[in-house]
Structures are given as C-alpha cells and as structure tokens.
C-alpha cells in the first residue's frame, strides 16, 4: 500500500527495481502504474531468484503483468545490467526502488549508477536501511568480517553517500525505508 500510494502521489510512470526476490513488490508496482494510466518497470535480481517458488515470471503471469515488466536475472549483481542501461542510453526512470544487495559494495555503486538513469525530480527509495547479515548462517555471509556482518550497510550508503550528495534533497525515512529526490540542476 505504501508503494502504491507513493506512485499515485508522485505521478510515477517509469520504475527501476533493484532486487525483486519473488516479484511481489514488482506486481504491486505494476498494479499501481496501471491505476495511474500505465508505465514501465525494469526489475533486476540475481539468477538465484529464478529458482524461487513462485518466481517473478510466475507471479507476473498470474497477475496479468508479464508483458508490462522487463525483468533480468544477473549472475553477480544488478550493477552489471545498469551499466548496460547506461551504455544504451534508451531508458530513464522517475523512481528507483532499491531492495537488493543490502551491502556497501552493491548498494553504494548502485546509488551512483542509478543517478545516471534517474530523471531530475525522480525518487530513490532504499528498503531495509537497518538490515544486517548478523543472523544469517549462509556460507557467503559467514565469510564476511564480523564488522561487515553487524553493520547496517544500506544505512551507511544512505548516511555517507546519498544524504550528503548535492543533487539530492527532500530526504525522509519511514518504516525502514529512506526516500531521496533528485533535484533539477
């Protein structure tokens, strides 16, 4: 409901979604775009998301949005796909929803890449500002130094990169999400 209200309130028509897990958020965003007269979504996650049950393709088909969303499965990071979008110079977005990576490396670079794809006046929303990998028992997480496992890395990106950036303003936080608007320069 929060995302749908935001899309309506800000007249969003083109969305870049970084991280989709099963694709539930993407379906909600597609429904909200349909309610405001249509739009487009590019949604990117890791190849491992393809194996989830249900996966984004199945959910989009069930909801009737399979032909309205471009989705990509990447082997390492959504950042590689964004590099391609920047190279192609065919798409810009008025909203980027960041709900993947959740670490300094992916989310930090993603901020600067999204900046190249985000229209002036567009918004970035960072989900899970205070999430940590502290309680994960996955091998990849356990290989990280303790400091990285206990640090809310999306929060670090928000505080150290996004908020001080001269091209962003209208910052606010709500329910673990950080909102920032790209100013018209």
Predicted regions and their residues:
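S-adenosylmethionine/decaboxylated-SAM
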Residues: 1-185
């Amino acid at each position: 409901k929060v995302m749908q209200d935001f899309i309506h309130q800000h007249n969003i028509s083109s969305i870049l979604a970084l991280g989709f897990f099963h694709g539930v958020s993407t379906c909600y965003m597609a429904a909200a775009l349909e309610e405001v007269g249509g739009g487009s979504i590019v949604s990117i996650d890791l190849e491992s998301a393809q194996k989830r049950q249900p996966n984004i393709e199945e959910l989009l088909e069930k909801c009737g949005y399979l032909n309205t969303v471009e989705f990509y499965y990447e082997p390492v990071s959504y950042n590689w796909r964004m590099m391609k979008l920047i190279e192609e110079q065919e798409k810009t977005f008025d909203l980027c929803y960041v709900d993947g990576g959740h670490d300094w490396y992916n989310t930090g670079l993603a901020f600067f890449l999204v900046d190249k794809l985000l229209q002036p006046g567009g918004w970035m929303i960072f989900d899970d500002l205070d999430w940590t990998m502290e309680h994960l028992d996955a091998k990849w997480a356990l290989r990280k130094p303790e400091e990285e496992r206990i640090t809310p890395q999306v929060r670090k990106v928000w505080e150290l990169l996004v908020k001080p950036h001269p091209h962003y303003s209208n910052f606010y936080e709500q329910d673990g999400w950080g909102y920032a608007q790209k100013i018209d320069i």
